[in-house]
Amino acid sequence: MRFKHGSTLYAAAAALLLMSAATGAARAEDTIKVGILHSLSGTMAISETILKDLMLMQIAELNAHGGLLDKKIEPVVVDPASNWPLFAEKARELLSKDKVAAVFGCWTSVSRKSVLPVFEELNGLLFYPLEYEGE
């Protein structure tokens, strides 16, 4: 199978499938849920709304080509509203309540620091859209 567009999403989706199978998150259903955790309101909305739109576009493209191993990707979009503590709350909701296999989001360092304990506790998988400045 050869992909022309959105190769990052495809690689991430493949990794997500392997991780979900390894962690027991793979389901017999016809969809794989993924969380989208970008601010759609508040001060960061101007930068992050387009990232949400891009993810939805890439997911639609992937689904139009048959999905991932014959399963459709189902996005679950939440708005942490540029509120750093709310990022952790929304991440917990995505992983625990919505049972997503992975989350795409957390553009800022402070949002990633906010969600890190949640992802570690729940053994979640986070893909963030830029290089980390590191520590």
Residue ranges of each PLM-predicted region?
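Bacterial N-terminal signal peptides
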Residues: 10-21
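Short, well-structured alpha-helical segments in soluble
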Residues: 81-101
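N-terminal secretory signal peptides that target proteins for export/translocation
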Residues: 1-6
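Extracytoplasmic "Venus flytrap"
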Residues: 35-56, 78-85, 107-110
